[in-house]
């Protein structure tokens, strides 16, 4: 009977990404795993799925399969010669011939669990001053029923029926050399050489279960947007007794209504009147912890910037504080009473300025236009 197309076996199209292929394999292997599915033909289906994934998950093998299919090249290398072929799969083939397989990772060796990531949104104040927050996160934890063993309590393990305890299986592969036989880790026992007499009813043999876990996170004083902290050992459980992975909490900081932040420095925009700019003044302004009085010298112009040293954010690594910069904007009045206008005209005359007064009122401008003023 002819072999089915590997893409068809996994139920994905030929342009599927590696993640899509992996997701399809996990779903199907779980469905047809001999320890879970006792229906006739499930074992063969599981082998077919494993073989398809073994090829499509490897870039070189997938490229060879896409080019030659199941049969591989016939009658040598054809008109392309050696220069026109992709020999990316040779390393895998030769390693199986000359002992390269011994360098493969031991499937029974302890392995660290996967690292996880969690995004936490915090306020500007929480980032500046630091705080403690509780989060809820769904993650894999060690199964409480089997304690991570994967077997039903009270049952034992037996020799894997798929690899007969070898931990590895022989698989035929299509390559540019034709069909070659190589070894791979047994997909059923994952190299242990044993299988469950009866899998754990809670985790179905995985050794882990998905639960919502509450954790307390310390937000460091001075943390900035996109920075992260590591919670050691709060990731996924390890494999074969390996350590847990870590949890990385990434911070998203909401903007402040008062300040703008750039690293450890903060900026405050201060509007002052024409009189304050011309005569100078003392103005109370906010800082991160309290209000302070800022002296505005006479003749201050728009764009003037004042620096308040060490009034910025504390550096998250403990390297001092940033600065507070105050940006000045002189605001021109939009409405003047008659007395204010008289004073400004007098001021202009003293300066020798010939002012052609303009009105912001449409009716006044219209009257002046028709009078020819």
Curated annotation (Swiss-Prot):
Localization of this protein: Cytoplasm
Transmembrane segments: none
Positions annotated to bind Zn(2+) 2: 160, 163, 186, 189
Residues in CXXCXGXG motif repeats: 143-150, 160-167, 186-193, 200-207
Cofactor(s) it depends on: Zn(2+)
Molecular function terms, GO-annotated: ATP binding; heat shock protein binding; unfolded protein binding; zinc ion binding
Keyword Metal-binding attributed: yes
Positions annotated to bind Zn(2+) 1: 143, 146, 200, 203
Note describing how the cofactor binds: Binds 2 Zn(2+) ions per monomer.
UniProt keyword annotations, A-Z: Chaperone, Cytoplasm, DNA replication, Metal-binding, Repeat, Stress response, Zinc, Zinc-finger
Annotated GO CC locations: cytoplasm
Zinc finger (CR-type): 130-212
Primary localization: cytoplasm
Limits of the J domain: 5-69
InterPro entries in UniProt: DnaJ, DnaJ_C, DnaJ_domain, DnaJ_domain_CS, HSP40/DnaJ_pept-bd, HSP_DnaJ_Cys-rich_dom, HSP_DnaJ_Cys-rich_dom_sf, J_dom_sf
Biological processes, Gene Ontology terms: chaperone cofactor-dependent protein refolding; DNA replication; protein refolding; response to heat
Function noted in UniProt: Participates actively in the response to hyperosmotic and heat shock by preventing the aggregation of stress-denatured proteins and by disaggregating proteins, also in an autonomous, DnaK-independent fashion. Unfolded proteins bind initially to DnaJ; upon interaction with the DnaJ-bound protein, DnaK hydrolyzes its bound ATP, resulting in the formation of a stable complex. GrpE releases ADP from DnaK; ATP binding to DnaK triggers the release of the substrate protein, thus completing the reaction cycle.
Domain notes: The J domain is necessary and sufficient to stimulate DnaK ATPase activity. Zinc center 1 plays an important role in the autonomous, DnaK-independent chaperone activity of DnaJ. Zinc center 2 is essential for interaction with DnaK and for DnaJ activity.
Oligomeric form and interacting partners: Homodimer.
Similarity comment: family membership: Belongs to the DnaJ family.
Protein name: Chaperone protein DnaJ
Gene name in the database record: dnaJ
